[in-house]
Curated annotation (Swiss-Prot):
Source organism per UniProt: Lucilia cuprina (Green bottle fly)
Tissue/organ expression: Detected in the thoracic perisympathetic organs in larvae, and the dorsal ganglionic sheath in adults (at protein level).
Signal peptide: none
Entry keyword set: Amidation, Neuropeptide, Secreted
Protein known as: FMRFamide-8
List of residues that carry Phenylalanine amide: F9
GO biological process: neuropeptide signaling pathway
Recorded superkingdom: Eukaryota
GTP-binding listed as a keyword: no
Amino acid sequence: AAGQDFMRF
């Protein structure tokens, strides 16, 4: 789920 964390931006 760490990959989608930067997608939050």
